[in-house]
Each structure stands twice: as structure tokens, then as C-alpha cells.
């Protein structure tokens, strides 16, 4: 491709409204342009990268035995009503009526459509197991689209759905998809981690997320220093206490704490050990008999809202009780709450159950109890794992301790079981002629999100540093003053032809531009290999080669360059 015939829309300045580096660089490199909030057009450079990601995803899905189909982006509301998600999904589901006043949605996902399709097309066990996938545009009406392609409203996704009559084949397909996703990200040259995950609104049992590691990642990953165990912080299991609860050594005493509204203030003012304090959070309960529930974690720990949401006594989705409701029920506000004398269900974290001589709010404004002990000052409360793990704690497999990393979720695989097939009556006849509800798996990859995540992991102060497999072009040719030198023009043109004939994707910068602009553009858009051609190089019989990732420069003889680049691109 010649730049003179190409739409290379680079920008020097960083757009003011671009918060993360991938958004900034995708705009500056001329990959995307904003049409409206969360809606973008792909320019040629961006589309080339997107198509390469898509091709790798498609190849690995086909290799894993999945079959490609295509379903409509517009979906009839009746299917969503059938599964109950018409009411559950919320405002992210964009709903509209056609001219006949029928309800439709723009699909954020396709479980309903694929289940409807399969219940009409598959009737016998002989047609199973079956794994179907598509690469299709999705739409989620995010309340606050941000971060460019990381959290846009419209995005490209690969979603696959498998159907089974038995758990064994469902497990086999799940493992095949796990391997396929690992292959996809490995082929793209990305550092990633598969992690155990919560199933979220889609539901189901087994679930893994695939995260591209990046400092800017929204998700916190807890992984083992001694094994392959890794989990999203929402799912990571806290270790059970190994030491018994210590004996009481302090008397219970009521202390005035007028300036201690937070654990940090309490610890600082009274020189307390933070591990000897607890914080009490009041959430809405699941029943009329218990409209409020107290959740208690150690002062240095954080409540895990996903774990708390799954407690039977807690209303789902989890909702913190407003201060007015708390004051009406307890007589004190946040900052002065604790378990002693609290007239509501109390659920404590396992780590709190072994605490002794600890401090907590006294349920009177500006007062705390010090020296609290279970089974002396109050009954031992129900205990559960309701906190986030912390670095250095032992992992559940016993093979290491927790370490933390940030990641960007780009893939998610689920075992759905019968969540959708049962509500939609998707059944087939088994080998005994009996009707059986289908088991399902669901496997998603954010194709457009991978592009942004790859940039978040691969950039420097000059621009994008693409991994070889998804770079828009492999080689950039930079002829110096080619419009003034016939020698430079002739050699640049010949090299362009030779590399193209060798199957290498080349971008020849044939513009009448200053060398500084040409170099800056090549580095900004992240082409892995550049070749500089000038009169001095020609006199010396060499090309100047530069590797974008390492910055390494070397002179390559004319007759060796094509083979050198073929090897460089392959590696």
C-alpha cells in the first residue's frame, strides 16, 4: 500500500476527551473516529487490525470444531420475555418498536436467538453435541460509554454457543474453548491470564475470564505464586483462618470517639492495630422479616460485593441501605455501627470470627466499643467468605500465595447448563426416545476490545508497538527525498514490489513530507519493521533497518534484505 493512495489520518495532539492510552493512540493513529457517544467508525488502519484479530479468532474457532453462522443484530422482544431477561436486563438493553408496533431489541448478546434457532432445527441426540459461533456487532446502551473501544456501546464480538445432552461432552467443549481462547491470545503475542470468574447476569456454573494483562486494566486478578490458579478478585476464595480465636484479655468498654468517622481515623487517634477493628456495612435484606442485614469485615479488609450478593439473606442485586433508613433502624449513622446489641441478622467474614478484643462502633453516634469478644459480649454470628483476598495470603490449592495484577477482560466462557434451554423449552429426544432439556455452553470474545487491550499492553512514548500478528502492516518503507532522487525512487519501488511479491504487507511512504513526519507516523501507527532508503545508504549498498519494539538498528545489504524481513516477520 502506498501512503499517497491511503487514508493515513494521523494526529500530533492527544485528544482532550480520550482518557486511556488505547483511546488516545487509536485516535492519533487514525484508526477510529467518533460518531456519537460510544459509537465509532473504523478507518483503514483500524480496520486492518480488527480484521487480523477477527481472522485469528475465526481460525481457532474452526480448528476447535465450532461452526460459523450469522444471527441478526435486531431481535424480537418475545424471546427476551420468554427467558425473563426483558425485565431483568435493565436500560442497557436498547428497545424499540417497528412500524407494526412490535417490540424489538438491539442484541447485546444472542442466547435467546440461538436457543430459539436450535429448538427449531435440532430434534435428535444424533445431531449433538453442536457448537455454533458468529462474529457479529453487539449493542449495549452503556450509561457512560468511556475509554474508546474499551467500553463502547457498539462493538464487535465473537460469541459461540454449544448444545449437549450430557455433562461429559459439555466439559469437553468447554476445555476445547479454553484451549482455543488461549491459542487466540498466544498467537496475537499478548500476555494474558485465564481466571476463575463469577457468571454474572448470564448465569450458569463454571466460568473463566481471559484477561490481557495491563496496568490500566479495570479488573484486579488474584493469582498464585506457585501454581496456575488465578481468579478475578470477585471470585478469589479467601483462606479460612488457621489459628483459633484468642482468649479475651480486655474488658468491654464504651469510648467517646467524636472525630473518628472512619477506620483510618479511629486507628490513628487511638493507636489501634487495624486488624483489631471491624467495619459494619448495612445492606438491604431479601425478606420482609429481615429488611436490613449487617455485613462485617475486618478493618483492613474490603467487602466483596459479588460474594455478598449471593448470600441468601441479602437482597439481590446488592444495595447499601441509605443513611436515613439506617438511623431509623439503629439510631446511629455510618461510622458508629457495630455488632454489639444490633437487632438484625449479622453475617461476618470468616476472619472476623476468630477476632478477640476488637473495636467496633457502639451504634451510638461518636461512640465505639473497645475490647469486644465473641460469646462473651454477643453471640458468634453467622460466618461466610464475604471479603476480597489480599496479597500474600495462601491460595486455595495450597501451592502458593496470592499476588495481584491488573487485567482487561477480553474473553469469557461459561457453562450455562439449562438456564436458557429450560425456560425456552429447548429439548431433544435421547437414544431412548425421551425428551431431554439441552445443556448449553456460552463462549464470548470481544474482538474490537482485543484491539484496544493490545495497545494498552504494547505502547511507548512514540505510539503503538504492535505485536507482529495483528500489526496493520509488517514493514514500512521510508524513502528519503524520493521526489528529488531517481535512485531512491527506483530502489524504493523495487523493494516495495519484492516485499509484496514475498507476501509481506508493506506501507510505502511516498508522500512529499519531511523525514521527521514520516518517521513519526510509522512509529505512531506501530509498524514492526521499517526500512530507510537514502542516497547515503545506496552509496554504501545497504538499507537501514529498524525494529519498532527493540529500537535496534542495523545495516542490511541490498541482496539480503528481503530474506531478512521474511524471517523477521515470521518470528
Swiss-Prot record:
Function: Catalyzes the attachment of proline to tRNA(Pro) in a two-step reaction: proline is first activated by ATP to form Pro-AMP and then transferred to the acceptor end of tRNA(Pro). As ProRS can inadvertently accommodate and process non-cognate amino acids such as alanine and cysteine, to avoid such errors it has two additional distinct editing activities against alanine. One activity is designated as 'pretransfer' editing and involves the tRNA(Pro)-independent hydrolysis of activated Ala-AMP.
Places the protein is found: Cytoplasm
Stored InterPro entries: aa-tRNA-synt_IIb (IPR002314), aa-tRNA-synth_II (IPR006195), aa-tRNA-synth_II/BPL/LPL (IPR045864), Anticodon-bd (IPR004154), Anticodon-bd_dom_sf (IPR036621), Pro-tRNA-ligase_IIa (IPR002316), Pro-tRNA-synth_IIa_bac-type (IPR004500), Pro-tRNA-Synthase_IIa_type1 (IPR023717)
Enzyme class name: ligase
Pfam families: HGTP_anticodon (PF03129), tRNA-synt_2b (PF00587), tRNA_edit (PF04073)
Name of the molecule in the record: Proline--tRNA ligase
EC number(s) reported in the record: 6.1.1.15
Top-level lineage group: Bacteria
Subunit structure of this chain's protein: Homodimer.
Keywords: Aminoacyl-tRNA synthetase, ATP-binding, Cytoplasm, Ligase, Nucleotide-binding, Protein biosynthesis
Keyword Amino-acid biosynthesis found: no
Catalytic activity: tRNA(Pro) + L-proline + ATP = L-prolyl-tRNA(Pro) + AMP + diphosphate
Keyword Transferase: no
Cross-referenced CDD domains: ProRS-INS, ProRS_anticodon_short, ProRS_core_prok
Entries under Gene3D superfamilies matching the protein: Anticodon-binding domain, Bira Bifunctional Protein, Domain 2, YbaK/aminoacyl-tRNA synthetase-associated domain
Amino acid at each position: 500500500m502506498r501512503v499517497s493512495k491511503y487514508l493515513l489520518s494521523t494526529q500530533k495532539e492527544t485528544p482532550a476527551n480520550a482518557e486511556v492510552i488505547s483511546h488516545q493512540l487509536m485516535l492519533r493513529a487514525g484508526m477510529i473516529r467518533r460518531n456519537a457517544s460510544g459509537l465509532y467508525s473504523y478507518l483503514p488502519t483500524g480496520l486492518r487490525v480488527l480484521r487480523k484479530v477477527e481472522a485469528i479468532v475465526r481460525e481457532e474457532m474452526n480448528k476447535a470444531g465450532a461452526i460459523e453462522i450469522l444471527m441478526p443484530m435486531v431481535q424480537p422482544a418475545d424471546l427476551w420475555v420468554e427467558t425473563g431477561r426483558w425485565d431483568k436486563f435493565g436500560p442497557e438493553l436498547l428497545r424499540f418498536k417497528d412500524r407494526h408496533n412490535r417490540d424489538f431489541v438491539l442484541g447485546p448478546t444472542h442466547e435467546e436467538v440461538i436457543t430459539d434457532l436450535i429448538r427449531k432445527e435440532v430434534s435428535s441426540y444424533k445431531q449433538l453435541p453442536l457448537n455454533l459461533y458468529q462474529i457479529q456487532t453487539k449493542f449495549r446502551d452503556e450509561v457512560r460509554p468511556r475509554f474508546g473501544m474499551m467500553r463502547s456501546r457498539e462493538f464487535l464480538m465473537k460469541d459461540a454457543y454449544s448444545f449437549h445432552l450430557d455433562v461429559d461432552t459439555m466439559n469437553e467443549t468447554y476445555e476445547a474453548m479454553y484451549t482455543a481462547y488461549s491459542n487466540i491470545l498466544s498467537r496475537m503475542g499478548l500476555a494474558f491470564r485465564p481466571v476463575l470468574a463469577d457468571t454474572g447476569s448470564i448465569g450458569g456454573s463454571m466460568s473463566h475470564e481471559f484477561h490481557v494483562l495491563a496496568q490500566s486494566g479495570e479488573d484486579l486478578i488474584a493469582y498464585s505464586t506457585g501454581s496456575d490458579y488465578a481468579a478475578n478478585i470477585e471470585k478469589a476464595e479467601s483462606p479460612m483462618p488457621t489459628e483459633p480465636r484468642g482468649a479475651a484479655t480486655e474488658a468491654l468498654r464504651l469510648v467517646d470517639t467524636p472525630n473518628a468517622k472512619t477506620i483510618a481515623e479511629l486507628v490513628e487517634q487511638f493507636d489501634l492495630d487495624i486488624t483489631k477493628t471491624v467495619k459494619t456495612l448495612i445492606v438491604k435484606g431479601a425478606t420482609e422479616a429481615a429488611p436490613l442485614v449487617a455485613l462485617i469485615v475486618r478493618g483492613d479488609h474490603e467487602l466483596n460485593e459479588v460474594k455478598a450478593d449471593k448470600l441468601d439473606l441479602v437482597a439481590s442485586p446488592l444495595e447499601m441501605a441509605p443513611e436515613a433508613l439506617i438511623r431509623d433502624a439503629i439510631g446511629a449513622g455510618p461510622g458508629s455501627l457495630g455488632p454489639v446489641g444490633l437487632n438484625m441478622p449479622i453475617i461476618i467474614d470468616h476472619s472476623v470470627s476468630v477476632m478477640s478484643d476488637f473495636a467496633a462502633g457502639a451504634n451510638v453516634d461518636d461512640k465505639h466499643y473497645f475490647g469486644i469478644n465473641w460469646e462473651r459480649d454477643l453471640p458468634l454470628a453467622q460466618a461466610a467468605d464475604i471479603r476480597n483476598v489480599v496479597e500474600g495470603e495462601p491460595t486455595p490449592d495450597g501451592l502458593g500465595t496470592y499476588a495481584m495484577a491488573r487485567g482487561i477482560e477480553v474473553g469469557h466462557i461459561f457453562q450455562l447448563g439449562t438456564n436458557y434451554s429450560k425456560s425456552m423449552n429447548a429439548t431433544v429426544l435421547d437414544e431412548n426416545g425421551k425428551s431431554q432439556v439441552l445443556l448449553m455452553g456460552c463462549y464470548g470474545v470481544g474482538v474490537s476490545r482485543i484491539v484496544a487491550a493490545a495497545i494498552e499492553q504494547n505502547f511507548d512514548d512514540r505510539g503503538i508497538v504492535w505485536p507482529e500478528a495483528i500489526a496493520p502492516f509488517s514493514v514500512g518503507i521510508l524513502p528519503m527525498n524520493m521526489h528529488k532522487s531517481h535512485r531512491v525512487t527506483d530502489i524504493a519501488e523495487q523493494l516495495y514490489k519484492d516485499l509484496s511479491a514475498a507476501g509481506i504487507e508493506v506501507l510505502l511512504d511516498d508522500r512529499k513530507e519531511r523525514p521527521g513526519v514520516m518517521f513519526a507516523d510509522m512509529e505512531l501507527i506501530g509498524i514492526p519493521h521499517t526500512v530507510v532508503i537514502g542516497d547515503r545508504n545506496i552509496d554504501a549498498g545497504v538499507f537501514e533497518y529498524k525494529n519498532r519494539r527493540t529500537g535496534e538498528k542495523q545495516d542490511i545489504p541490498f541482496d539480503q534484505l528481503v530474506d531478512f524481513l521474511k524471517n523477521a516477520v515470521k518470528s
